[in-house]
Amino acid sequence: MFEGAMPALITPFTKDDRIDREGLQRNIAFVEEGGVSGIVPCGTTGESATLSAAEHEEVIDIAVECSKVPVIAGTGSNNTGEALQFTKHAADAGVDGVLLISPYYNKPNPAGLLAHFKKIAEAVDIPMILYNVPSRTGQDMPVDVIVELAKVENIVGIKEASGNAAKVSQILENTMDDDFVVLSGEDGLTLPIISMGGRGVISVAANIVPDKMSGMVNAALKGDYETARKLHFEIAPLIRALFLETNPIPVKKAAELVGLASGHLRLPLAPISDANQAKLANELRKLGVME
């Protein structure tokens, strides 16, 4: 179920700082038309850190109501009880799976990581994808912890955003017998990860160019690396531009520039600089998605 290109959705806000329900629905329809295989609301790209609990649930509810593709909801937290609460709501709402970031700031030891994820997995019977992103959490999940969690029946995969291809290879090597899916958490490393046995990407760029990201991933999964490489290099400059500043600052501006629903960023994130906006706009024009 969990393979292909799946955008980590931005969360559009209205001028009075509410969830832009209609805008979110339009954005979901746009990426679906672009061929994505799933959507991921309430991740880092969706500004989950500044959503209230009620808003978190609202975004997930909207996604489930209108999506025609599988929904993987971000339900992680550095508070195990809160992560469990979010996960229970997502399961009740009808999502197809959940994405659980490793606890940030706390920096739990390996025993704590195992206990955190196992507690949630035992309490809620839904497919769960781990999320390793040390640049955000301050901690890189050890391979042996990931391998042990892969043996838990409803922990079915990981979004790997460590930027370490050797580590990804080690995870794949040690989970091949566990029916465990490895997804890239970095757009620029998606193609090499698929070449090692990864099954797709949870993507920032797919918010803006879902057709090209889906085309690249699908070609690679079919073994058509000539087409996949061509698309990879075509969108690589945009991917770099989308990370000129902290995600999701550039992607929300890109969404605005191409006519998607976006709205403001919530503090403490501030708008993109004029210089970086110009660079971003230049890449959007090169791809023909902005006039």
From Swiss-Prot:
EC category: lyase
Pfam families, sorted: DHDPS (PF00701)
Subunit structure: Homotetramer; dimer of dimers.
Molecular-function GO term, any one: 2-dehydro-3-deoxy-phosphogluconate aldolase activity
Any GO CC annotation of this UniProt entry: cytoplasm
Subcellular location: Cytoplasm
Catalysed reactions, semicolon-separated: L-aspartate 4-semialdehyde + pyruvate = (2S,4S)-4-hydroxy-2,3,4,5-tetrahydrodipicolinate + H2O + H(+)
InterPro entries for the chain: Aldolase_TIM (IPR013785), DapA (IPR005263), DapA-like (IPR002220), Schiff_base-form_aldolases_AS (IPR020625), Schiff_base-form_aldolases_CS (IPR020624)
GO BP annotation list: diaminopimelate biosynthetic process; lysine biosynthetic process via diaminopimelate
Keywords: Amino-acid biosynthesis, Cytoplasm, Diaminopimelate biosynthesis, Lyase, Lysine biosynthesis, Schiff base
Functional note: Catalyzes the condensation of (S)-aspartate-beta-semialdehyde [(S)-ASA] and pyruvate to 4-hydroxy-tetrahydrodipicolinate (HTPA).
Protein name: 4-hydroxy-tetrahydrodipicolinate synthase
